[in-house]
């Protein structure tokens, strides 16, 4: 079943001085419970596409649908997670996680239980009453992930959520996200500049062309799950997809990315 449909979407940013075409005729379908990563050069419109899916922007032309319904505004069944955790410093961990419950006026008792379960799932049991300044960057992002999941959305949109972290923490959280996705089974769209992150996490990788962004290539990652990192986790399939992705992103002629083609 299709969770997200992007139909002929183009988007232009307009100012008094200029018009910037960010996206051009995007066509994309993402299946229910599928994990999709978006990769491409800086400025190709990855984050813009994510914001269109979230209902934070309206496309200039075209249509975005989630669950068969047009996205015209932010929806409660869609969560968006950013590069920075944006935790409220005066709130405790559990209070930060519960914020969407308050905003959406959901049942506090039932969702308090879910919040505690998510904190346990992400290794934060015992930190419920700590404040953000008492946590490491990786722990803060775990709290942000719990907050994004607490109201049980069907779709999770993630805009480079681990990019500001050190390499070791980033790898740890990538593996943890894969495990959580395996348990929660959400539809996830994940923006990244990391080839390793894209191949490790994705069922499919959407490679976007330079601006104006188009879907230049769709790569299917056929490696078994759960996936691991390191020498002992060598996977010919991940190596193959990573090499193809590297070739696409670092091609001498960027115009190669401008012509969409099917999976190889």
What is each model feature region?
Residues 130-133, 151:
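Conserved signature/switch motifs of ABC ATPase nucleotide-binding domains
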Residues 91-98:
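Short coil-to-helix segment of the ABC ATPase nucleotide-binding domain corresponding to the Q-loop/switch region
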Residues 1-3, 12-25:
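A short, flexible loop at the N-terminus of ABC-type nucleotide-binding domains that lies
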Residues 54:
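Helix-to-loop junction immediately C-terminal to a conserved catalytic motif
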Residues 98, 102, 109-127, 179:
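Conserved ABC ATPase "signature" region
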Residues 39-41:
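The feature captures the beta-strand-to-loop junction immediately N-terminal to the Walker
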Residues 156-159:
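Catalytic Walker B motif of ABC-type/P-loop ATPase nucleotide-binding domains
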Residues 62-74, 114:
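Conserved ABC transporter NBD signature motif
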């Amino acid at each position: 079943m299709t969770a997200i449909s992007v139909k002929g979407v183009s988007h232009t940013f307009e100012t008094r001085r200029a018009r910037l075409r960010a996206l051009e005729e995007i066509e994309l379908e993402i299946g229910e419970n599928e994990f999709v990563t978006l990769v491409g050069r800086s400025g190709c419109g990855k984050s813009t596409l994510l914001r269109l899916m979230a209902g934070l922007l309206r496309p200039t032309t075209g249509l975005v649908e989630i669950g068969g319904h047009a996205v015209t505004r932010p929806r409660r069944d869609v969560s968006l997670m950013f590069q920075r955790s944006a935790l409220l410093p005066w709130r405790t961990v559990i209070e930060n996680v519960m914020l969407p419950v308050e905003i959406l006026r959901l049942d506090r008792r039932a969702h308090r239980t879910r919040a505690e379960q998510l904190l346990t799932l992400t290794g934060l049991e015992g930190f419920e009453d700590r404040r953000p300044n008492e946590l490491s960057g990786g722990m803060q992002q775990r709290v942000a992930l719990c907050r994004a999941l607490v109201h049980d959305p069907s779709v999770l949109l993630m805009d480079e959520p681990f990019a500001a972290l050190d390499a070791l923490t980033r790898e740890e959280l990538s593996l943890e996200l894969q495990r959580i996705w395996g348990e929660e089974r959400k539809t996830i769209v994940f923006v990244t500049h990391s080839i390793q992150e894209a191949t490790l996490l994705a069922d499919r990788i959407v490679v976007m062309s330079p601006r104006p962004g188009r879907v230049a290539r769709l790569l299917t990652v056929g490696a078994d799950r759960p996936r691991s990192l390191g020498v002992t986790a060598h996977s010919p399939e991940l190596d193959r997809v990573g090499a193809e992705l590297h070739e696409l992103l670092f091609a001498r002629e960027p115009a190669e990315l401008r012509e969409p083609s099917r999976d190889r």
